[in-house]
Regions:
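RNA-binding accessory domains that recognize and position tRNA/RNA substrates
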Residues: 1-217
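Cysteine-nucleophile active-site neighborhood
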Residues: 215-237
C-alpha cells in the first residue's frame, strides 16, 4: 500500500527501476519508457519542480511512477510547476510511500514484472479487478512500440543546443552537416547534441524507406533508441 499522487486513475505496465539522482522530468518524458511503470530508487523526487523546456518528447508515454517519499517541494529558479501538478497534467498515475529499493532488488533478482497501480481518493480499488487487469496485460515481449511513439511525418529539427546556465537553449546558425535521424522513440536531448556539432537534423518516421532517406542526401544517418521489444522493431532496419 502507498499514497496516491498525480493523476487519479489506474495504470498497468511493466515495472522497471531507475537509479538516477537527478533528471526525473527527462526520465518520465523519455519515450523509451513507453508501456512501463518507473520505480525510482532515489528518495527525494520533485525538488526542482518541472518546466516547459526539459521534456524528452512532446508527449509523456510512461504509464506510471513509484516514489519512496512524498514529492519534495520545488526550489529552483527554472521551476514553473510542481511535479504533482505536472503528473496530473500529463495523466500519469503515481504512488508514494513504498520501499522502492526493496522493489528494485526484487526486479533485479526476478526480472521486470507486470504490475498495476491505482490512485483512488475514495479507496474503491477492487483488488481482484486490478489483479485481473495485470494478468490480462500481454506485456512488452513482441510488442512494437516504435510505431506508436515515432513521429508520423518528416520534420526539420529547429536546432537548439543543449542547455547552459548562461544562455539556456540557444538556437544554432551556420549548420555544416545534414543528419537524418530515424525516430524509433528519439529523445529531444539527442537532437540538441547534434545541434552542438552544427548539424542540420531531419527527423523521419520509423518506417521511412531507404529510398526516402537517401533522397535527402544526408551526411550521416542516425538510428535512435526507443521502447518495446527490439525483436519487434528489427523489421524497420
Amino acid at each position: 500500500n502507498g499514497i496516491g499522487i498525480g493523476y487519479e486513475g489506474t495504470a498497468t505496465g511493466e515495472v522497471c527501476f531507475n537509479t538516477s539522482i537527478t533528471g526525473y522530468q527527462e526520465i518520465i518524458s523519455d519515450p523509451s519508457y513507453a508501456g512501463q511503470i518507473i520505480n525510482f530508487t532515489f528518495p527525494h523526487i520533485g525538488n526542482v519542480g518541472t518546466n516547459n523546456e526539459d521534456n524528452e518528447s512532446n508527449k509523456v508515454w510512461t504509464k506510471g511512477v513509484i516514489f519512496n517519499s512524498e514529492i519534495t517541494n520545488p526550489s529552483n529558479y527554472r521551476s514553473l510547476m510542481d511535479l504533482d501538478l505536472w503528473l496530473k497534467k500529463n495523466k500519469i498515475v503515481g504512488l508514494t510511500g513504498l520501499d522502492t529499493r526493496s522493489l528494485t532488488n526484487l526486479i533485479r533478482d526476478k526480472g521486470a514484472p507486470r504490475g498495476t497501480i491505482s490512485h483512488n481518493r475514495q479507496g474503491n480499488f477492487g483488488i481482484k479487478k486490478l489483479i485481473n487487469s495485470t494478468l490480462k496485460w500481454p506485456g512488452l515481449n513482441g510488442l512494437d512500440l516504435a510505431k506508436t511513439v515515432s513521429t508520423k511525418y518528416k520534420f526539420v529539427w529547429k536546432g537548439f543546443k543543449t542547455w547552459t546556465k548562461e544562455q539556456g537553449y540557444k538556437k544554432i546558425k551556420n549548420k555544416k552537416l545534414k543528419v537524418v535521424a530515424i525516430d524509433y522513440g528519439i529523445k529531444t536531448n539527442i537532437l540538441r547534441y547534434f545541434s552542438n556539432f552544427y548539424c542540420d537534423v531531419i527527423v523521419v518516421p520509423c518506417d521511412a524507406s531507404a529510398d526516402d532517406i537517401l533522397a535527402l542526401k544526408p551526411s550521416g544517418i542516425f538510428l535512435s533508441n526507443g521502447p518495446g521489444d527490439p525483436a519487434a522493431t528489427g523489421k524497420y532496419a
